[in-house]
A protein has these predicted regions:
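Alpha/beta enzyme core
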Residues: 41, 57, 91, 103-212
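N-terminal capping/small domains of soluble enzymes
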Residues: 1-96, 102
Length: 212
């Protein structure tokens, strides 16, 4: 069998196949259909400090060019993840990447500390989430807030930190350089491309949250 192993920010994956954060959940959802030990890593569903119920339905809208989703970071919270999901994930035979989403730099540090203590192999920082100190604008929209989120995550992390960039900016290279300057070990491209589908009969967005 050929050696397909790759080095991701100093962590060896058996192959370059990584289940992206989101619909793969915490791995349990797919283990009846696929041997999770055969992939390089699982990047779990986005985690927040407190549990989140997510956006109201409808959350999914089909378009002629793809599909929009607006789940809204539904998750049980980082403490529940560390208690209930990590013991199971550690037995899956693959590397675990925690995707973290904070509303403040302090929350990014707290999240990084908790998932590191739980035993994840890498951390992915979601800077597309809103910064409550900047009127709700996403951290990844500006270089200074990107740096703040990255530095905070690095301060709490004991494992490599990957910053997941938002495509909804004027110059993604500028944001990437800010993350690198703040100590990011790697970059993940990209998070959701914003879109909207209109229900022509109702003259309203199809998604309850308007965009996805």
């Amino acid at each position: 069998m050929p050696d397909l192993s790759v080095n991701l920010c100093g962590v060896t994956l058996k192959n370059p196949i990584v289940a992206a954060s989101g619909t793969f959940g915490f791995g349990r959802e797919f283990e009846d259909y696929y041997d999770l030990s055969e992939i390089g890593a699982i990047c779990v569903k986005g985690l927040t400090v407190a549990p989140r119920q997510g956006n109201p339905p409808p959350r999914i809208a089909e378009t002629p060019s793809g599909m929009l989703n607006s789940v809204g970071l539904q998750n049980p919270g980082v403490d529940a993840f560390c208690e209930r999901e990590m013991p199971h994930l550690k037995n899956c035979g693959t590397k675990i990447i925690a995707n973290i989403s904070g509303n403040t730099p302090e929350e990014f540090q707290i999240l990084a500390e908790k998932v590191t203590a739980a035993g994840v192999d890498l951390i992915e920082v979601n800077i597309s989430c809103p910064n409550i100190h900047c009127g709700g604008a996403a951290f990844g929209m500006h270089t200074d807030t990107t740096e703040a989120a990255t530095r905070a995550a690095k301060a709490g992390a004991g494992v490599p930190v990957i910053v997941k960039l938002s495509p909804n900016v004027t110059d993604i290279c500028e944001i990437a350089r800010a993350a690198e300057a703040a100590g990011a070990d790697g970059l993940s491209l990209i998070n959701t491309l914003l879109g909207m589908r209109i229900d022509l009969r109702r003259r309203r967005p199809l998604l309850k949250n308007t965009t996805g």
